[in-house]
Amino acid sequence: MIAIVKRLAGFPKAGTDWDKPPWEEIRPERVGNYMGEKPDHFPRTEVKIAYAEKAVHVLFRVEDRYVRAVSAKHQDPVCRDSCVEFFFTPGPDLSQGYFNLEMNCGGTLLFHFHRNGREGGIEIPGRDCDKLVKTHSLPRIIDPEIAEPVTWTVGYAIPTALLSRYCPVSAPRPKALWRANFYKCADGTSHPHWLTWAPVDDSKPNFHLPQSFGLLAFE
């Protein structure tokens, strides 16, 4: 899987306007594969990614049901809520480690760096998490679960200088390559599912498989 990452001059702070400038210029990627058994509830999940001079910008859009958000502070287990995730190595070399950036529909964040696989994760400190410009269209807490159809967006701008504190970074510019995958999950809801952008060949849901990452090609 390859996603083309366009540069947009003067890109604003993260926003939820999926079909308005500048996001309207970005082609969405579909998070349309799944792990484990095919879920009964298969929310349509798309993601857009772009870059500007000092940050990479990501925006997810989910046509969902059975939505909840109970994790309230950074590094809580947001994967148990209605959640989207961006796992990435900021370069082509997987041996440099990878980040997992997870956000529930209410905008609560889990952000770790993994040098040596899943068990060797490092929590990104709160002062660094706060440097991400975050946005979300739903309230921070959703409890009880919303069973009716609802479309939600979350997004963030990731400063590339922040990433370089943890590993080498291939600066976003034409011909730069990163490795990545995008995910959608909802482990603790009434209709759990584990969706992926790039296919992951594993019998059980497990997003921590960087060897299955696709490519982000900057232009």
Go through each PLM region and give its residues:
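Structural preference for beta-rich elements and adjacent junctions enriched in aromatics
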Residues: 1-219
